[in-house]
């Protein structure tokens, strides 16, 4: 899970929490020790959004790139970089975004 805290925000969080505890593997990517992170088997620190690459669709057909505005504060990896690593990709998330934008948006 990344960028969410369902153990806090869900109205029936007790049901979610019991299900989360029953999983063999649960990973929380978080900047803080949230309620969900505390119940997860693994917690991975994530960088602040000001340290991160990204993109978004502001409204239908209007796209924007997100560029880091500060140097990394700690030795953390962006969630998307971790996912790319897990699928044995040699690309960084920056490279992935660049390729995606060149092939599909620009």
Predicted regions and their residues:
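Non-catalytic alpha/beta scaffold blocks inside enzyme catalytic domains
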Residues: 1-106
């Amino acid at each position: 899970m990344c960028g969410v805290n369902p153990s806090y925000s869900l109205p029936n969080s007790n049901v979610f929490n019991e299900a989360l505890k029953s999983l063999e593997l649960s990973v929380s990517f978080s900047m803080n020790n949230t309620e969900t992170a505390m119940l997860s088997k693994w917690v991975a620190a994530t960088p602040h959004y000001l340290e991160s690459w990204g993109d978004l669709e502001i409204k239908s057909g209007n796209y924007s790139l997100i560029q880091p505005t500060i140097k990394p504060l700690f030795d953390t990896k962006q969630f998307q970089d971790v996912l790319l690593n897990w699928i044995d990709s040699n690309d960084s998330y920056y490279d992935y975004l660049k390729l995606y934008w060149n092939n599909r948006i620009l």
